Amino acid sequence: MAKMRVRFPTLVLLLGIVFLMAVSIGIAYGEKNVLKNHERPQEREQEERDPRQQPRPHHQEEQEREHRRESEESQEEEREQRREPRREREQEQQPQHGRREEEEEWQPRRQRPQSRREEREQEQGSSSSSRRQSGYERREQREEREQEQEQGSRSDSRRQRNPYYFSSERFQTLYRNRNGQIRVLERFDQRTNRLENLQNYRIVEFQSKPNTLILPKHSDADYILVVLNGSATITIVNPDKRQSYNLENGDALRLPAGTTSYILNPDDNQNLRVVKLAIPINNPGNFYDFYPSSSKDQQSYFSGFSKNTLEATFNTRYEEIQSILLGNEDEQEDDEQWHGQEQSHQDEGVIVRVSKEQVQELRKYAQSSSRKGKPYESGPFNLRSNKPIYSNKFGNFYEITPDRNPQAQDLDISLTFIEINEGALLLPHYNSKAIFVVVVDEGEGNYELVGIRDQQRQQDEQEVRRYSARLSEGDIFVIPAGHPISINASSNLRLLGFGINADENQRNFLAGSEDNVIRQLDREVKGLIFPGSAEDVERLIKNQQQSYFANAQPQQQQQREREGRHGRRGHISSILSTLY
């Protein structure tokens, strides 16, 4: 029992020691866990700031990036699908001419930092303002946009604004020297396909100083020439005869293709100006002049033959033929020898000076033009030989139609000469089938031509477009068939016109007391097609009492000016009455 008593306290003591050790070990382990839990947030923050301290597996990062990319793309597609119906509704509300611009600007717009809300507000504002505009304003803006596009697409903006107008700068010089020049207008169909029917017609102009001669030549084109300034003597050479005619201002003449001719300016002081309508024979739009003599500007057509052919043709040695007809062309090519030779027509070119004795000899047997009655079958005729077909105090309109002109009947060409006084207006009209090429002879003014917009651009509707230009001497403009036109003269204006396809052409005026097609409409039709009533339309038409030509200044403006002058005079008189 005593041993048991001793062992029991010892056992209890041992158990107590073990318990204390266990408690101390547990406390120590708990403190360690607390410290670890306290340090982990700091470690996580540091890991987030610098992920390289604890890198994740590479394949896990790739999967996460791919997942994010797919999520963003799907969200973008959903947003785009939600926007598409709204965009289509906005496009349907906008005018059709603005859709193409919106489509072109849509892609760049996605890249702009501007918000979608701002873009929608701008688009809705522009579409609503466009709907509020009148048809006339939309047409004006559309014309401006098309003109800007044409200006940007080509360097010559003026040419693109009006394809029917050709300034005097559009002439190309063929020959020029100190005695004059010969030049040709560019092809009518070169700038637009709207004038394809004029591809075989060209305008030629030559000017020469006093006492000069344009050398003999023939051409592979028919000509109708008109003297616009000065006087001339033209000699026409045929195989069996030679005829000379004296031409004055306004005289015209048919010159058949292949006819050899030469033109003299016999005046001592006045320059000569002649305009020709050329109709090429061999190649549409192109023609060539053939000269029997050589000069510094061209070679003789004899030089194109071989020596054997020339010797057999003239039954003479080639050396003699060369010295008489061709000249020493080798010396002409040598500049030093060329400038050392005595001055002759070969030095001057195709326009040479002549002496007064030579002028008298060339004019000895010349005939004058026909100034009364119908033109002859050959020989010159004057455009103002008959009374004008339209005339009043504001202007005169002369015309020679193909049925009255045997020379131009087979060419189906008419000739017109129009005189519009300063401040007058040639009333709006159109030609039923003739295309007119008009040359400004003298004066200044402007014209307005009405055409239909190109159907390739506007297939859903036909809208008119106005072509206008300032006119000055030497300018050319074209009046297509069926296109209404009006001409305003800011100074005394003189116009020469060549009518193409002129047989049975009819000129229809759109205003005035006579030959007015609008006036001839039925009364019921007038009330149906115009916004006003039939009575208002007829009253409006009758307001213009003039025919063909009228005052270019509106009556209302004249009345306001008269009232203004009267008001100023009345105001001054009232002041004077108070003083005296």
UniProtKB/Swiss-Prot annotation:
GO molecular function: nutrient reservoir activity
Keyword Cytoplasm part of the UniProt annotation: no
Database matches in SUPFAM superfamilies: RmlC-like cupins
Ranges of biased composition (kind: Basic and acidic residues): 37-72, 79-92, 134-145
InterPro entries with a match to the protein in the record: Cupin_1, RmlC-like_jellyroll, RmlC_Cupin_sf, Seed_Storage-Functional
Quaternary assembly: Component of globulins complexes which accumulate in seeds.
Known role: Seed storage protein. Accumulates during seed development and is hydrolyzed after germination to provide a carbon and nitrogen source for the developing seedling.
Protein's recorded name: Conglutin beta 3
Source organism of the structure: Lupinus angustifolius
Lineage start: Eukaryota, Viridiplantae, Streptophyta, Embryophyta, Tracheophyta
